[in-house]
């Protein structure tokens, strides 16, 4: 774990060893294997925040919601939720969690490598979107890497086989893929990451 000083243009090593997840929301959180650490600015050290009990658990991503629940994605054990008073639950019990996204309505969208897309509503109910070959309006693949909400409230979802736009009002997914005959379209159908800038423009990274 390294810190880069923009003024001095120098790096400072804060923590040795592998770091599996990094997240910032008021504080800097990192995941190392089955442990979550929080950076203590006053001491310059990383303090242990939580240890996930179990075998072969490796964290993949972190997210802190407005209720101070810490959501922890893993590489093979699904999704855990740690409340502010350190009560642990496991809303998703299996799968490799690629990313966690919170939209403007405070719903969570959980992207997975093989289990499709999970939607965790504010009432804690969970919906799982999977590809259905018989339904052209379903998500195009179960290998979901990232998602991002646009200014109109639509959710853009990056998968191994294309970009999906999900409209909450209709519950339908629209697919966008690369087409050599459309020079103004996607250059590659495999979408790795998505982000929205301050002007509302959606940026895509392909792989």
Show the residue positions of the predicted features:
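Carboxylate-rich, polar loop motifs that coordinate divalent cations or form catalytic acidic clusters
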Residues: 1-207
